[in-house]
């Protein structure tokens, strides 16, 4: 979902001086982390961190990682698969913009994808971790669209703290689809699963 590396630059406040890993080390770490799962990875999204380096230095981190994992990459994609002959389309993009409130983040997500037809929409930019659904009337009866913010692993502090943004604990989302094409989700929050690892109280 993007932002796989810190990609600090001297043009972005003091990020270059606060980075804890070199970009080379980050690339090695990301590639080695995902290699055991490479057969299940079909696409990598560019995030705003990767796009920053591409813009400033003409360095495409996502391409380097995708080539190492032998998968496609880009800004956004729609992937499809079948569950009992029903086609499920999944739209994914890193996303853009920020919001202090979950309800304004949800409305922006819907608005930004209104011209895209899919069953499941995935977005990661705003660091939230949640899933919501909207019933859609069709000639075949009610269908559902599922929207998911996929979470993040960035601790609270620095920019978030100075802007008084809400604390969004590190989290990830597990989506599942059963044989009857029912989409369910489970969220794993660090403050509920491993509170001792949190960087703030």
Protein language model features and the residues they cover:
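Conserved beta-sheet core of the metallophosphoesterase superfamily
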Residues: 90, 96-185
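Active-site glycine-rich loop that binds ribose-phosphate moieties when present
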Residues: 67, 73-79, 99-108
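Core dinuclear metal-dependent hydrolase active-site scaffold
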Residues: 78-98
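C-terminal accessory extensions appended to soluble enzyme cores
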Residues: 19, 171-201
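Short acidic-hydrophobic surface loop/beta-edge motif
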Residues: 76-85, 133-139
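Active-site glycine-centered loops adjacent to acidic/histidine catalytic or metal-binding residues
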Residues: 3, 47, 94, 124-125
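Core catalytic region of metal-dependent phosphoesterases/phosphodiesterases
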Residues: 1-73
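A general structural motif
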Residues: 39-41, 87-88, 117-118
């Amino acid at each position: 979902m993007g932002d796989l590396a810190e990609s600090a630059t001297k043009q972005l406040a003091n990020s270059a001086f606060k980075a804890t890993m070199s970009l080379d080390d980050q690339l090695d770490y990301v590639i080695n982390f995902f290699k055991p799962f490479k057969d299940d990875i079909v696409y990598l999204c560019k995030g705003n961190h990767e796009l920053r380096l591409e813009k400033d230095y003409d360095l495409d981190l996502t391409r380097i990682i995708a080539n190492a994992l032998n998968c496609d990459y880009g800004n956004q994609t729609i992937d499809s698969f079948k569950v009992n002959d029903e086609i499920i389309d999944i739209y994914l993009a890193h996303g853009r913009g920020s919001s202090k409130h979950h309800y304004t983040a949800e409305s922006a997500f819907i608005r930004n994808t209104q011209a895209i037809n899919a069953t499941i929409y995935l977005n990661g930019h705003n660091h939230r971790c949640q899933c919501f659904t909207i019933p859609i009337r069709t000639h075949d009866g009610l269908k559902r669209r599922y929207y998911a913010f996929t979470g993040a692993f960035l601790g609270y502090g620095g920019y978030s703290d100075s802007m008084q943004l809400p604390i969004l604990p590190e989290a990830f989302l597990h989506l599942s689809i059963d044989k009857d094409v029912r989409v369910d989700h489970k969220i794993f929050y660090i403050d509920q699963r491993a509170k001792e690892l949190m960087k703030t109280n």
